[in-house]
Amino acid sequence: MGQKVNPTGFRLGIIKDWTSRWYDDGPVIAEKIKQDQVIRNYISARLKKEKAGVSKVVIERTTKHIKINIYAARPGAVVGRKGEEINNLSQELTRITGREVKIDVIEVIKPEIEAQLIGENIAYQLENRVSFRRAMKQAIQQAMRAGAEGIRIRCAGRLGGVEIARSEQYKEGKIPLHTLRANVDYASVTAHTIAGAIGIKVWVYKGEVLVQRLDAIEEEEMKKMQERRNDSRGRGRGDGRGAKRRRRPAAKKA
């Protein structure tokens, strides 16, 4: 099942969190979900021109305002000179949503292992007539150098402009899709070339998330068990057989 399902959706609530964090009742839910998609599309389209490298947009809603966290490889391109770009973006989103919008920009430390940015980079190269094999292999090498434990890239469509569509993939390292504690980043991007649309899927394995937490829990349980054993030995039995014996005072020499 792990081979077929979306790796991000498969791990939601376990090691991954939702990108829309709010709760509501009634028919307004569908309207707000649609509005979230409009916000994401607008941000990605606007910041794509600035080459900010947006990997993720997290939306949080309160009763008074909307808070948006933008994860970008180049936060300076989002903020702009003296904060001009981010202020304009906030005002435009306030006009679209009808509510006050607050924007925070979070820097992506390693863009080479972000699946969304890898897919967008390959799509950009394919649209500029770069060989798909070269683009895929180069992305894999950069990701493995940056610290990824495994990566797989699949391209499907009229690769190289041929008449018959096909799919090709390259892989390095391991991608444990069935392991829920494995932090697998996934993205799907479309490249619009002269020959037609080419689908790009990227899986990046960044290591296990819960191993340290499980080890800490195990260690804590062992400590508690040892403390219980020590307490039970110290208390002893009710008849005094388990209690510690007192030493008799040494006899004084005459």
Swiss-Prot record:
CDD domains: KH-II_30S_S3. GO terms for biological process: translation. GO terms for molecular function: mRNA binding; rRNA binding; structural constituent of ribosome. Keywords: Ribonucleoprotein, Ribosomal protein, RNA-binding, rRNA-binding. InterPro entries: KH_dom (IPR004087), KH_dom-like_a/b (IPR015946), KH_dom_type_2 (IPR004044), KH_sf_prok-type (IPR009019), Ribosomal_S3_C_sf (IPR036419), Ribosomal_uS3_bac-typ (IPR005704), Ribosomal_uS3_C (IPR001351), Ribosomal_uS3_CS (IPR018280). GO terms for cellular component: cytosolic small ribosomal subunit. Residues 221-242 have a biased composition (Basic and acidic residues). Residues 39-109 form the KH type-2 domain. Pfam families: KH_2, Ribosomal_S3_C. Residues 220-254 are annotated as: Disordered. It comes from the Bacteria. Residues 243-254 have a biased composition (Basic residues). Belongs to the universal ribosomal protein uS3 family. Binds the lower part of the 30S subunit head. Binds mRNA in the 70S ribosome, positioning it for translation. NCBIfam families: rpsC_bact. This is Small ribosomal subunit protein uS3.
